[in-house]
Amino acid sequence: MMRRTLENRNAQTKQLQTAVSNVEKHFGELCQIFAAYVRKTARLRDKADLLVNEINAYAATETPHLKLGLMNFADEFAKLQDYRQAEVERLEAKVVEPLKTYGTIVKMKRDDLKATLTARNREAKQLTQLERTRQRNPSDRHVISQAETELQRAAMDASRTSRHLEETINNFERQKMKDIKTIFSEFITIEMLFHGKALEVYTAAYQNIQNIDEDEDLEVFRNSLYAPDYSSRLDIVRANSKSPLQRSLSAKCVSGTGQVSTCRLRKDQQAEDDEDDELDVTEEENFLK
């Protein structure tokens, strides 16, 4: 009878060990994966910040409507990264940290299991010793009685630790299920809040892009290509109002001026080319150093 009770307790302890090991394994994996998820989200936020900077830099070089549309888009996209930062902080606090605490919780449960196993082993040892004593000295009542007393003490201690372990594991299972519900509910809530805000921001950003007036900007671009040269037009009017002799003299002056200007431009261009060559050589030397 005593042997069967001991075997039943051992089977129960093994089942509890399996439950604790299962939580230790899977909660550890969940913690690592959720932590990686949060890190990836934080990196996405960092890349988005770089994208915002580049969009603003590009917008500064563009035509008015495109510039305004891109800058407004960048503002909305930057706002989204503020929400993403809040998402990262909430996930860390509400999901990753609670999972981390299970490392300590599992360690405490393993200590409880260890204490129970120690008591069970002591009980099994006393039972074996009693059986040997009965076989070797069946008539020695004093030794047998002493062994029975030791066995009774060990059995009581094992029973007490078993009840404590069973109660502890029951509380552990209840808390585990409650925590799982809380953690995953928090995860879903945080993600829904972020994506809800993201939908609003992306809608505004989309509208900013759609509001870009292509025709107006194209007209601005064309005007920049064919800007009116008022000084040239004024020279033509003045030339038409002069006498033939004045026109001839003016033509010579213009021709001379053109030659000087052309020579000067060529010299300036040559100087710039020389400077560029020097810069290229300097950069090449720096690269090879």
Swiss-Prot record:
Top-rank lineage group of the source organism: Eukaryota
GO biological process, one term: membrane organization
A GO CC term attached to the entry: centriole
CDD domains tied to this protein: BAR_FAM92
Mutation effect (residue 132 to E): Abolishes ability to induce membrane remodeling in the presence of CBY1
Sorted UniProt keywords: Cell projection, Cilium, Cilium biogenesis/degradation, Coiled coil, Cytoplasm, Cytoskeleton, Differentiation, Disease variant, Flagellum, Membrane, Mitochondrion, Mitochondrion inner membrane, Nucleus, Spermatogenesis, Transit peptide
Pfam families for the chain: FAM92
Region (BAR-like): 10-220
InterPro entries (alphabetical): AH/BAR_dom_sf, BAR_CBAR1/2, CBAR/FAM92
Outcome recorded upon mutating residue 107 to A: Reduced membrane-binding and significant reduction in membrane remodeling activity
Extent of Acidic residues compositional bias: 271-289
Transit peptide: 1-47
Disease: Polydactyly, postaxial, A9: A form of postaxial polydactyly, a condition characterized by the occurrence of supernumerary digits in the upper and/or lower extremities. In postaxial polydactyly type A, the extra digit is well-formed and articulates with the fifth or a sixth metacarpal/metatarsal. PAPA9 is an autosomal recessive condition characterized by one or more posterior or postaxial digits.
Record remark: domains: The BAR-like domain displays limited similarity to other BAR domains.
Oligomer status and interactors: Homodimer (via BAR-like domain). Heterodimer with FAM92B (via BAR-like domains). Interacts (via BAR-like domain) with CBY1; this interaction is required for targeting FAM92A to centriole and cilium basal body. Interacts (via BAR-like domain) with CBY3; both proteins form a ninefold symmetric structure at the flagellar base; are recruited to the annulus in a mutually dependent manner and regulate annulus positionning.
PANTHER family cross-referenced by the UniProt entry: CBY1-INTERACTING BAR DOMAIN-CONTAINING PROTEIN 1, CBY1-INTERACTING BAR DOMAIN-CONTAINING PROTEIN HOMOLOG
Full protein name: CBY1-interacting BAR domain-containing protein 1
